[in-house]
């Protein structure tokens, strides 16, 4: 093939994992007409995930830059907090539901909601909206990655569990907390190859709004709130246009996790009630709304062993594969959105600015730049998020259940998330890449 023809050959980009960040990354690349994008999803079809989560204003700005259609999809399904504050309530000491609903008696601290500006949604509903935006034949289901090889001048070779072998110029692994790509990239024996149990677990329930109102009161049930107490805390908010109330009950676990990489084990309402048996009556009533049989979800993260880098050669990790985080900042997925934006911006520069013979080295430079730009902020989040879990559960040294101290610590840490310059991040990535290319 002649050189001028080779220059027109599009990059082939494999995205491993079709979760929220995998889809966003794909849509960001497709929006920029970057190469031929293929998502390899291990499931046989899109899973119906009922869990809820939320995105900050910073994350939504990144979505808009990735592809405005992503933000439109979120807007269709998101629940906004109608109040200007998020309150953190004492779930432990109130002796009556009336006392528990009295802000003067039971609010530990409150935060201006405008700073984080969360939009909450059901994960599966938002995922379905984004999936509709994908062109046909972009997704291949039933493709569980088992290994890859990245060497020489050839493309990256991907090996799947079904025996199929594929090739790509670039691999972006969004394959989650227990990432196969991470283990290959770092080596199976590397301390950071596997996420570790954070000693926190969570139980989830979607309860009818009338029952939530009975337990918490009308005002509390219609906004995002948290209840704090010893060794546990509850985060709850309305979803699905306030028809359903989403409840997460988090607990501290002093035991090791004995189920390997299995993150979900059967549990029961009895375990929930035991965790809050000495709490206020409103919390016990809310806990009683959980189903009799439910699941206990272990929270794994990379706080004990952060990754030394997020990219090697022509393979990059993004989202939980790079920086698996506990959910206590409410910003783990938001960090993945930032990852996707930086990757899209840098790969656009590779495609538009590289001759064919330079593309391999420039791909590697772009992915290294991505890693360098994203690693400090995202790893700070992983560490701080685990510590925030202890803060909510009155385990943080010298603070305990002191609402004034809790608020000061919350604001100090959370400001790092919301006081962030997205354009500055993009400019930093572009400029660092351009400097790297010049040096070659």
Swiss-Prot record:
Chief location category: membrane
Record's function text: FAD-dependent monooxygenase; part of the gene cluster that mediates the biosynthesis of asperfuranone, a probable antitumor agent. The polyketide synthase afoG is responsible for producing the 3,5-dimethyloctadienone moiety from acetyl-CoA, three malonyl-CoA, and two S-adenosyl methionines (SAM).
Protein name: FAD-dependent monooxygenase afoD
Underlying gene: afoD
Glycosylation sites: 352
UniProt enzyme class: oxidoreductase
Disulphides: none
Membrane topology (UniProt): Single-pass membrane protein
One Gene Ontology molecular-function label: monooxygenase activity
Entry binding sites for FAD: 41, 145, 320
Keyword flag Ribosomal protein: no
Key words of the record: FAD, Flavoprotein, Glycoprotein, Membrane, Monooxygenase, Oxidoreductase, Transmembrane, Transmembrane helix
GO BP terms: asperfuranone biosynthetic process; secondary metabolite biosynthetic process
Location within or outside the cell: Membrane
Phenotypic effect of disruption: Completely abolishes the production of asperfuranone. Produces a large amount of intermediates including 2,4-dihydroxy-6-(5,7-dimethyl-2-oxo-trans-3-trans-5-nonadienyl)-3-methylbenzaldehyde.
Entry's family note: Belongs to the paxM FAD-dependent monooxygenase family.
Induction field: Expression is regulated by the asperfuranone cluster transcription factor afoA.
EC nos: 1.-.-.-
Cofactor: FAD
Transmembrane segments annotated in the record for this chain: 10-30
């Amino acid at each position: 093939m002649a050189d001028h023809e080779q220059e027109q050959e599009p990059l082939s980009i494999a995205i491993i994992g079709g979760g929220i960040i995998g889809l966003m990354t794909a849509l960001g690349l497709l929006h920029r007409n970057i190469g031929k994008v293929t998502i390899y999803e291990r499931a046989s079809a899109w899973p119906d995930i009922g869990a809820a989560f939320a995105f900050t204003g910073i994350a939504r700005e990144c979505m808009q830059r990735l592809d405005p259609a992503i933000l439109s999809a979120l807007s269709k399904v998101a629940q906004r907090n109608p109040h200007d504050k998020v309150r953190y309530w004492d779930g432990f000491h109130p002796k009556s539901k009336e006392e528990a609903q009295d802000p003067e008696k039971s609010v530990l601290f409150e935060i201006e909601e405008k700073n984080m500006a969360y939009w909450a949604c059901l994960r599966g509903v938002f995922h379905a909206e984004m999936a509709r935006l994908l062109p046909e034949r972009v997704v291949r289901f039933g493709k569980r990655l088992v290994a890859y090889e990245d060497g020489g001048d050839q493309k990256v070779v991907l090996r799947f569990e079904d025996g199929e072998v594929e090739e790509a110029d670039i691999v972006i692994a969004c394959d989650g907390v227990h990432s196969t790509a991470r283990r290959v990239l770092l080596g199976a024996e590397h301390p950071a190859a596997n996420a570790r149990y954070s000693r926190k677990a969570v139980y989830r329930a979607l309860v009818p709004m009338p029952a939530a109102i009975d337990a918490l009161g009308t005002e509390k049930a219609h906004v995002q709130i948290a209840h704090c107490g010893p060794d546990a805390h509850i985060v709850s908010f309305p979803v699905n246009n306030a028809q359903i109330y989403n409840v997460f009950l988090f607990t501290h676990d002093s035991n090791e996790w004995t189920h390997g990489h299995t993150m979900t084990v059967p549990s029961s309402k009895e375990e929930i009630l035991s965790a809050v048996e000495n709490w206020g009556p409103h919390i016990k009533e809310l806990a009683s709304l959980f189903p009799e049989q439910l699941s206990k979800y272990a929270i794994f993260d990379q706080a004990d062993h952060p990754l030394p880098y997020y990219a090697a050669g022509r393979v990059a990790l993004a989202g939980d594969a790079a920086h698996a985080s506990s959910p206590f900042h409410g910003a783990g997925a938001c960090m993945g959105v930032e990852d996707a934006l930086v990757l899209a911006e840098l790969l656009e520069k590779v495609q538009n600015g590289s001759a064919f013979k330079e593309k391999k080295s420039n791909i590697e430079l772009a992915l290294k730049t991505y890693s360098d730009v994203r690693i400090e902020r995202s790893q700070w989040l992983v560490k701080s998020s685990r510590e925030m879990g202890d803060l909510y559960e009155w385990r943080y040294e010298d603070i305990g259940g002191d609402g004034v101290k809790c608020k000061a610590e919350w604001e100090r840490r959370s400001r790092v998330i919301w006081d962030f310059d997205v354009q500055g991040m993009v400019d930093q990535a572009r400029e660092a890449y351009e400097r790297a290319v010049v040096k070659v």
